[in-house]
Amino acid sequence: MRDPLTDCSYNKVYKNLKEFSQNGEDFCKQITSILQQRANLEINYAKGLQKLATKLSKTLQSAKKNCLVSAWAWVSEGMKSAGDLHQKLGKAIELEAIKPAHQVLSAHEKKRKSLENEVEKTANLVISNWNQQIKAKKKLMVSTKKHEALFHLVESSKQITTEKEKQKLLNKLKKSTEKLSKEDENYYQKNVASCSTRLKWENTLENCFQSILELEKERIQLLCNNLNQYSQHISVFGQTLTTCHTQIHCAISKIDIEKDIQALMEETTVSSTENKSEFLLTDYFEEDPKNAMSKERQTSSIKSKLLRLQKDIEKASRDQEGLERMLRAYSSHSSFSDSESKKSTAALMDENSLKLDLLQANSYKLSSVLAELEQRPQPNHPCSNSIFKWKEKQTHSSVKISRPVLMKRLENVVNRASSDGQRIPSPSSTASGVTQLGNGLCKALYPFQARQDDELDLEKGDIVTIHKKKDEGWWFGSLKGKKGHFPAAYVEELPLNAGDTASQA
């Protein structure tokens, strides 16, 4: 059975981060285990030194007091002091490094299990909806074939049956029509419901991605803190451990926590240029050119389905316009809106836009069949190159809809580090995945509500100056004096001479 989740960009990034996180957890556990062994060695060594110091002290008590005995007494005191020092080091490692590490690892494990269960739950909903659609389609196809056979039986029996038998057949046909209508509606509703199910799964992946990312940052910070504590306690050993400590301190002084976080972000950044979500399209018996239906009945049935789609498309378009107006109102009058309202409205608009694309793809597919039946030219639609067919006992159709990937990017961390006063080298203009531009322009096709501090708010028709194009589907530019990121899928790039026209205007 085809897996609808395998090729999803969100899923790939989430799995890569999970693997990275697991490696980090294993590393942290190994470091903690080694520290525990070191603490045990220090405590056991301290006990041994203290026993020897006590034994030497008792020996000296029975000896005659002289300079030699006094010197050995200092040796005994030195052993006691060294024992205390090693014991304090062992206890400090246990208290300040091992205990916090166990607490963090335990909390992380519980959190990760909860996140993984949430992702698995929503993924199962997507797969269940996918399978339910195929099941409902199979059931609808069988019922349609039976209905057509009954219809032909009624048509062929008009002249040779009595009124009573004819009425009986008509009653059967009526029941069959009602049953067929219910199954058709059930199949259609499952297809439409796939939008919200898919979005819920992708939003869960995005939220879990951010949560695991925060856990990784916390783990990196923990290891850095442990190293600093270790360095402080080793340094009190005195001059005899200076050489060893210098090497450790030199290594610790080279630690750059922001560099580690930057490496983490680079490992987990979205590598695909766009995110494509695949949805099943409705496939009806009437679309099969080899079916037994007459062209008139095929045409009539397809037109009724197109009418239903058109009504839903018009409703979705009105909803989209309403949501756009709402977002514009939020931007213009910030006093009666908050970030959660804006985020919720933007999410609704994203879902509605996706639903509209699916409805239009279904409408285009049926319109193409209708045009072929009526011997008219085939209609044109942007999604025509994104519709695919494959066979698994039956022929299935699906569409891949392009959408921007909204996960947090590496620049967020770079900007945050810069604001803290730490300079992070900027990537070269020829680095992989980045295109440096002069003053290229693009025009906003749809409104976009910023979800992060480093993103731009877009209104339909805005002209944005492009500074950089990133491979993960986000561009960097400026609008009305503000610089930030925006999704490339929401804009169209203008020709180079448009810059002169815009500047003259």
UniProtKB/Swiss-Prot annotation:
The organs and tissues expressing this protein are described as: Present in pulmonary arterial endothelial cells (at protein level).
PROSITE patterns given in the database record: F_BAR, REM_1, SH3
Q: Which residues carry this modification: Phosphoserine?
A: 114, 478
Q: Which domain of life is it from?
A: Eukaryota
Which SMART domains does the entry link to?
Answer: SH3
Q: Which Pfam families match?
A: FCH, SH3_9
Q: Which GO terms describe its cellular component?
A: cytoplasmic vesicle; cytoskeleton; plasma membrane
Q: Which UniProt keywords apply?
A: Cell membrane, Coiled coil, Cytoplasm, Cytoplasmic vesicle, Cytoskeleton, Endocytosis, Membrane, Phosphoprotein, SH3 domain
Q: Name one GO biological process term.
A: signal transduction
Topology of the protein relative to the lipid bilayer: Peripheral membrane protein
* Limits of the SH3 domain: 437-496
Coiled-coil segments:
101-128, 160-222, 295-332
Q: What is its main location?
A: membrane
Q: Where is the signal peptide?
A: none
Query: F-BAR domain spans which residues?
Result: 1-260
Where does the UniProt annotation locate this protein?
Cell membrane; Cytoplasmic vesicle; Cytoplasm, Cytoskeleton
* Residue ranges occupied by any REM-1 domain in the UniProt entry: 292-372
Q: How does it assemble?
A: Homotrimer. Interacts with DAB2. Interacts with NOS3, DNM2, WASL and CAV1. Interacts (via SH3 domain) with DNM2; this interaction allows the recruitment of NOS3 to dynamin-positive structures.
Quoted from the entry, the domain comment is: The SH3 domain mediates interaction with NOS3, DNM2 and WASL.
PANTHER family registered for this protein in UniProt? NOSTRIN, ISOFORM H, PROLINE-SERINE-THREONINE PHOSPHATASE INTERACTING PROTEIN 1
What this chain does, per the record? Multivalent adapter protein which may decrease NOS3 activity by inducing its translocation away from the plasma membrane.
Q: What is this protein called?
A: Nostrin
Species for this entry: Bos taurus (Bovine)
